[in-house]
A protein has these predicted regions:
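Residues embedded in well-ordered beta-strands within globular domains across many folds
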Residues: 9-12, 155, 166
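Catalytic cores of alpha/beta
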Residues: 1, 52-60
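His/Asp/Glu-enriched, well-ordered alpha-helical/loop segment
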Residues: 25-44, 59-149, 153-156
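Glycine-centered positions in the ABC transporter ATPase nucleotide-binding domain
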Residues: 169-170
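Catalytic metal-binding/acid-base residues of hydrolase active sites
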Residues: 12-13, 47-48, 76-77
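Histidine/acidic-residue-rich, glycine-tolerant segments that coordinate divalent metal ions
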Residues: 1-27, 80-81
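Short, Lys/Arg- and Gly-enriched loop/turn segments at beta-strand edges
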Residues: 160-166
Length: 172
């Protein structure tokens, strides 16, 4: 890939528009990530689809396929006031101006949201949250259950509630 680009971070989230002429959108980083099959697309899947709209999640999933999509949390610590209309939302961070500043997502919740928003299976979301990120950064010894691979496992129920964690083969 030219210039070493292999991961589109925060895909379609706050990446802006490149406008040369009124009402005409130019090619930006999002289109480049979508167009190039080799580039992974990272997505933040919050409960309301604020970071990435559920329709866009489905489109990106269709474009990138099962092996070039990565779920991320974008988790950060902000404690600004919750704006009107967001009461009860627990996975978004707001700055002190009331603007979205990140998420309070854990990856299990991001997986659950992806399943809800797109119809992805539990197998799909595990791939997006484990196998694909491992491949993207060159960690070939993890991200899947196989002989000779590092035993980092998360035991969940059918709706992604974490029950147990095994790290480097040890129950945590």
């Amino acid at each position: 890939m030219p210039y070493g680009l292999c991961i589109g971070t925060h895909h379609t989230n706050a990446t802006g528009d490149r406008i040369f002429y009124p009402e005409v959108r130019g090619v930006c980083v999002d289109e480049t990530v979508n167009y190039n099959r080799e580039i992974y697309a990272e997505m933040i899947c919050d409960s309301r689809g604020i970071h990435v709209d559920p329709y866009m999640q489905r489109l990106i999933r269709k474009i990138k396929g099962e092996d070039r999509l990565i779920l991320i949390s974008d988790s950060c610590v902000f404690d600004g006031p919750i704006p009107e209309g967001y009461d009860g939302v627990t996975d978004l961070c707001f700055d002190f101006a009331g603007e979205i500043a990140g998420s309070k997502l854990s990856l299990d919740v991001a997986c659950r949201n992806m399943m809800k928003h797109t119809g992805a299976s539990i197998v799909d979301v595990f791939r997006y949250a484990s196998y694909n990120p491992s491949r993207a950064i060159g960690f070939l010894d993890r991200g899947e259950i196989a002989v000779g691979k590092r035993a980092d496992l998360v035991i969940v129920d059918h709706w992604m509630k974490v029950n147990k964690v095994i790290f480097k083969g040890e129950l945590q």
